[in-house]
Amino acid sequence: MPRSMAAVDAQMLWMSAKVPNDQFLLFAFDGSPTRVPDAVDEMRRRAQSCPELGLGALDNIKWRYPRWQSGEIGADQFVTHPGARGWPDCLDAVTALAADQLDLRRMSWRAHVFPEVHGMPAAATGTVVVIQIGHALGDGKRSAALAGALLGRRGAIPPVAAQRGWLPARTVAAWRAHRQLLRDIEAGAVPPPAPPRPLLSINDSPRGNPVVRTLVVRREQLSVPTVTIGALTAISDALGGYLAGRGEDPSLLSAEVPMAGAGNGHAHNDFRNVGVGLHVAVDRAQRARLIAEELAAQRRRGEHPAMRAASAAFAATPAALLRWGTGKFDPEGRVAAVSGNTVVSSVNRGAADLSFGGASVVFTAGYPALSPMMSLTHGVHGIGEHVAVSVHADSVNVDVDDYVGRLRVAIGR
């Protein structure tokens, strides 16, 4: 039976018509199957046994929210890209996939198989599988779980029950909780929101072809004190130096970091973006401490009742009103300041227990989408003992090779 989408998921669906938001989850395996069609058939059988992978969008009534409905897993959801290729050519092919965004009314995900890739990091020759997922179907954490189900991870993925309620009551509750939040901020019990940051060249609108790069390291190279903090510290070092070398002032450099929500099971997307200063002017040890403190502060802010009340009020927004508001969004609009100059999305994709045609997973990567205000984004993705730090950049606004070279040095310190 169809179930209604949560407001935040519907907004993701409608926004995809303005700003493409498909996610591309890359998994690299340490060998190539003898028979690729058999490995693809196995993946299809796994999909058929997971109800959440059978969902598609039904959006046929303007005044109500779209619904999730179950459907068949089609053969066209599995695309094999034949032939041998090198790792750089594979990344170029992955980048090109973004030109064909999903229509969630037809399919909410698609699997791309590159069966023979040479010169991969951490493996000489292997297979690359890219799972393309519409953002309405899941945020970074849920999409990783769905991809895991396709690639052999055991365990059910729980369905989501959309939260509804009476908008006036929830609005009043949110207003009262917000007043308490302001009092708590003034008393120093809760941190204020991160301040807006001035624009830099990496905040120019993309003008060229997108380019992706991936650095793969052992987990212990970044996990001081955590992988996310280690990656942010290295990115601060590399990006601060890159910008300063071009005559820009990186002193207020900041990252926009998606932070997982409370996990209340009411939406496929449960996260919020927070601004985190990168503190380029201090030494690495102090920088790591300051970044850790800011992340902890934003986590405390997210746990305040006002945040939950605001989410509940948003969930009760009438569908027609939210659809109208999303339709008014101007993707070409510019703002004078940003919460973060670059995106750093960090997701732990679990144990190295995935397989494709008998080959074991070696590493996983992801490439957060560029946007009209963002010409450089980062993905930090771990599986097992390997972490991939990936860069997605506009080829005109960013000297990708220079920046990635700096990032490689910063990670190795």
Where are the language model's segments positioned?
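N-terminal alpha-helical "arm" segments
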Residues: M1-K18
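Soluble acyl-CoA-dependent acyltransferase catalytic core bearing the H(X)4D motif
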Residues: M1-R3, L26-D38, R44-Q48, L55-P372, ...
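Generic N-terminal amphipathic, Lys/Arg-enriched alpha-helix
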Residues: P20-L26
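Extended, hydrophobic beta-loop-alpha segments that form or line the acyl/peptidyl-thioester binding
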Residues: M373-R413
